[in-house]
Amino acid sequence: MMGLSFPVLLLLVIGFFFGWLLLLKFKLLFISLLALILGYKSIAVFIGFNAPVSFTTQKQTGAIRVVSWNVARFIELARNNNAGSNTRKKMLALLKEQKADILCLQEFHTSENPGYYNNIRAIREELGFSYHYFPYDKDGDRNYYSSVIFSRFPIVDSALLRYPRPSQPEALVQADIQVNKDTIRVFTTHLQSQRFDKLDYARMQKIKSREDSLVYHSIPIVAKLKRGIVIRSIQADIIGEVRSNSPYPVLFTGDLNDVPNSYTYFKVRGELRDAFLEKGYGLGRTFRGLSPTLRIDYIFSDSRFSVAQFKREKKNYSDHYMLVADLQLNNP
C-alpha cells in the first residue's frame, strides 16, 4: 500500500527539501536529499521525463502499432438500436482511428445472443482485423467476457494461463504472432481489482469530507486493498516466470490494477521497457477514478524492441484511457 501513498510522500519530501533550503537548515536538508536519493528507483518509474511530442499518425517503416485498452465491456451490453449507444460507437471509432496492428483489450465483452452486441464481429469487420484470440469465460446466456488479442498479422500459436483462485476469471492471454519473418510473443491480462462497490466509494467520499469516523470507514477499504495486493503479487510472480521463458521477443500489455511503485509492477516488468517511460511525460494517469496519479495500465516490451512513440488517448469513454505505442523490432 506504500505505492498508493507514494505521491503524497514524494510531495512532502520535496516540500521539506525546499523548506529546509530556504531556512538554511543544512542537516535537515541533507536528510530530505538522502530520502530522494534512496527513493530514486520509485521516482524514476513514477514520472515520465520526456519532452511532450505530438504523436504522428503515419507510422515509420517497419513499426508495429500496439493499442492496449480496458474497454469496461464497451459500457453497454444489450442492444438499444442497431449500432449501439453514442459511447460504444465512439469507442469503436476511436479504435479504428489508431490504425493499430495489434489490439489488446481488457474487460472485453461480446455475445452471440441477438439481444446483445457481437463486438468480436464488429472489430473484425469494421476495423479489418483478420486474426484474434479470445479465450472467454461465460457471462450469461451466449455472452462472453475476457481479455482479447486482435492482430493484422497471423497468430501462429496461442495459450491461456488461469491464475489460481480466488482470482478467477482473471487470466494471462498469450499469442505468438508472425510479423513478416519474425515471431513475437504478445501477452495481455487484467489483474485482480480492488473489488470496490458503491458502499466503498461512499465511504471514500465520507473520508474525504471528514463527515464521520475516519477509522470506521477506512477499515473495510484497507482490508480490500491488502487482499488485492496479496492476490496481484501471486499473479505477478506467475507472469514473471512465464515471460522470462519466452523464446521470442516479448510484448506485454494490460491493466495491472497497481501503480509503478508496487511489487506487481516491478515483477511483471522485469527487464522490459515501459513505453510510457521511454516516450511519455508527466504522471501518465490511465485510470480516471479515485486519484489523478493512478497509472495502472501498461505497455512493456523487451530490449529487442525500440519505442518510436507513445500516447494516451484521454477520452472519457471508458474508466481507463487507451494506450498507443509504435515499436520497432530490432535484430530479433
Where are these regions (language model features)?
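Active-site metal-binding loops of divalent metal-dependent hydrolases
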Residues: 71, 108, 191, 255-256
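Internal/C-terminal transmembrane anchor helices
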Residues: 24-47
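Extracytoplasmic/secreted envelope proteins and their assembly/folding machinery
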Residues: 43, 92, 117-120, 147, ...
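Acidic/histidine-rich helix-loop elements
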Residues: 68-88, 109-112, 195-228
